[in-house]
A protein has these predicted regions:
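Intrinsically disordered, low-complexity proline/glycine-rich segments
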Residues: 1-169
Length: 169
């Protein structure tokens, strides 16, 4: 995998591909990071980027929260609290806070903003691309983790839509 900082220099950011088990984040033909489900029915995902690994999974009694854990120490790095209408807050252990918002029919655009409302990036599910905006105050590792977490939320939305469609038929 190549460092994410090389992807930041690209005007559009980077692209992603999806498969049954997860996503691959790419700059051109080179893989930057991955998000994979270790087993088909597993509720957790493993996020990996150039020597760093995290576990991302749902938590809370109703599954209404999300957690990012360090794979080595299992320490909590961040907590996500779901909100109504596709919104949510992502709180990191160091105090940094981001908002994750989705808009459009069937959630085609996911936007991550800083606590002050400045957009960090937009993830376009139909184009399978990530458009970077204001990444100056976000470390390379944190940016990668934010994109991978957003892809985790995309997969959750896809699975929820599939369940709703199956129940309706």
């Amino acid at each position: 995998m190549i460092p994410l900082s090389t992807a930041v220099a690209v005007p559009r950011g980077f692209t992603f591909t999806s498969n049954l088990y997860g996503f691959e984040l790419k700059q051109g033909d080179q893989m930057v990071a991955t998000l994979n489900r270790p087993r088909v029915w597993s509720s957790e995902f493993i996020a990996a980027m150039a020597g760093q690994n995290w576990i991302i999974h749902r938590s809370g009694f109703w599954g209404n929260k999300g957690e990012i854990l360090d794979t080595a120490s299992h320490q909590q790095i961040a907590v996500f609290k779901f909100g109504w209408g596709g919104k949510g807050d992502l709180f990191f252990a160091d105090g940094q806070k981001f908002f994750v918002v989705t808009r459009g029919c069937w959630h085609p655009v996911w936007t991550v903003t800083t606590e002050l409302g400045e957009p960090v990036f937009q993830l376009h599910t139909r184009e399978k691309s990530v458009e970077l905006h204001n990444v100056a105050g976000v470390s390379e590792s944190r940016l990668s983790l934010l994109v991978l977490f957003t892809l985790f939320r995309v997969r959750q939305a896809e699975e929820a839509a599939a369940v709703a469609a199956a129940a309706a038929s």
